[in-house]
Amino acid sequence: MRFWITTAALVAAGPAFAQQVAFKPLLEARARWEHLDQADFDAASDAVTLRVRAGLELRKGPWSVLGEAQGNLAVVDDYYDGLHGPANRPTIGDPENVAIYRAQLQYRSAPLTVTAGRQRIGLDDERFVGAAQIRNNAQSFDAVRTEIVPVQGLKLDLTYAWDVRTIWGTEGRGARQRGVGGHNVFANLGAATPLGTLTGFAYLVDQDEAEVQGFRLSNQSYGVRLAGARAIAPEAKLRYQLSWARQSDYHHNPTRYRADYWLADAALDVRGWTVNAGYEVLGADGGQTLTSFQTPLGSVFKFQGWADKLTTTPPNGVRDFYAGGGHGWKKLGGIDTLSLQAVWHRYQSDRLDQHYGDEWNLLATAKLRKTQLSVRYARYEADRFAADTSRFWLQMDWVY
């Protein structure tokens, strides 16, 4: 109901935009082939999909209205999408769907930005709150977000979200709802320091739906994050991130638990080359299901490998040591940019020191004007957790 009230407000605001209105069309398309082969399934999954987004933004002075729809079509549907398809194939979470992706009213000035309605939200590195853009039905929030910059170098970001529109689309049901209501509060305060941006945060996640793990994904996380970069030579830059958080149960969650999160990450950029390494820990409490550190609203694909084996943190938690490198080129043979990347992960449990498995991730990306082509591969080799998995993507994105 609150979403439609917000939408009605957007329509009612129309006369205020009658003169000197800037129109910005929004149009993008994605074509993708995704192949997924897991050792614990009889057959592999193959999904050839086409995702289109289309919309319009109207802007006058500090005010803007934006509306955008997204649709996903399965051209080849030899896969289980989480809702439909052969259950003897592994899940590729891209069900066919047509839905409103964004419908928002925004006021923007130098010290204050307020956005109301269905919107895309990505906070910091999106570990806790993100848009899950890798999936064709990306996540959005019915929310009011306020961003305040009272003085230079200080920013307060506050969001109240009453509904999360999930990747499962309009036909979502059961544990994979199309939307999950609740009283979600996201707050962070960032300050510029000589070492980088220091952010304190509080994320209150309310998955207030009994069919979604019996409320056990509702949690509250409080923590701090430092992200910065500095030149260490004329053509060399060091980038780094440090983060800590503590999580516990929240609202209707019937399980009492407490778990910690740690991240240390560093990358060195030298003349187009990058090497990086990091250590991320999602801690565990007593070893029971969903008493480990969970981030159900984050862009989890960005973390702990692309094979998607650890999107829900195991009961004994996870420790991820990773290292990688890559190289990027500009204006190479008519291509605007070309990049290559490789990352290796070693996964251990936080409790009991179990070796879950190892994973390799490989990515090649080329961009020419408005079109980007990417080839991605993930290989997970299981030891004490899940099953051997190979995943391959061939993807083309076009943005107007």
Regions found by a protein language model. Give the residues of each.
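Surface-exposed loop and membrane-interface regions of Gram-negative outer-membrane beta-barrel proteins
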Residues: H35-L50, K60-Q104, I121-R135, G169-E171, ...
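Signature for the C-terminal beta-barrel architecture of outer-membrane proteins
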Residues: Q20-K24, L58-V65, R108-V114, A132-T289, ...
